[in-house]
């Protein structure tokens, strides 16, 4: 990995990421290799590792054959924005579960937000919500807190907030 990364990105790059199962020893060893070979202090400015996602309590893996693919959920008629909300309900660094029940909750949340979309909110109120949303996401991409903020603001949601939600999280309401 270090050879590929440094070949494509150079001796230092902003972010290296992967699953939490790769943090040690894989990423630590590849960073040590690159740092020794290139004589740099750090190969990446930041290391980001995502938690594992289980399906109904069992870690998803190719060997178990229990992988859930977003494109297959979409092809089955599930709303891509609801799929995102289901994943965003847990913090990216935490191990978390995925299930039909969690996806159904996300679909209900999305439907509630869409139903409550209103233009009756002042621009100042909407801007305040968007500013809070940005601050929450800037704090280690805290998507569970962001969703909580948006649940509280859903009745006050207008097009400004909807546009920010699409731009920041890729969720269309």
Task: Describe the role of every protein-language-model region.
Residues 73-82, 101-103, 136-144, 155-160:
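Structural motif
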Residues 135, 144-173:
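Basic, alpha-helical terminal appendages of large translation-related enzymes
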Residues 106, 126, 162-165:
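Hydrophobic packing residues in well-ordered alpha-helices of helical domains and bundles
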Residues 1-121:
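Alpha-helical recognition segments enriched in aromatics with Gly/Pro capping
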Residues 119-132:
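Extended alpha-helical coiled-coil "stalk/arm" regions
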């Amino acid at each position: 990995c270090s050879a590929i990364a440094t070949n494509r990105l150079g001796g230092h790059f902003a972010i290296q990421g992967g699953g939490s199962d790769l943090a040690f020893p894989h990423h630590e060893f590849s960073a040590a290799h690159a740092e020794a070979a290139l004589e740099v202090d750090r190969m990446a400015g930041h290391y980001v590792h995502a938690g594992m996602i289980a399906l109904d309590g069992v870690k998803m893996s190719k060997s178990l054959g229990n992988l859930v693919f977003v494109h297959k959920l979409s092809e089955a008629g599930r709303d891509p924005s609801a799929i995102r909300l289901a994943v965003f309900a847990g913090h990216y660094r935490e191990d978390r579960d995925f299930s039909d029940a969690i996806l159904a909750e996300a679909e209900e949340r999305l439907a509630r937000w869409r139903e409550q979309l209103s233009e009756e909110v002042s621009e100042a109120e909407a801007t305040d919500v968007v500013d809070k949303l940005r601050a929450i996401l800037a704090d280690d991409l805290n998507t569970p807190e962001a969703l909580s903020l948006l649940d509280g603001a859903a009745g006050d949601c207008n097009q400004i907030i909807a546009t920010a939600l699409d731009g920041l999280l890729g969720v269309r309401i």
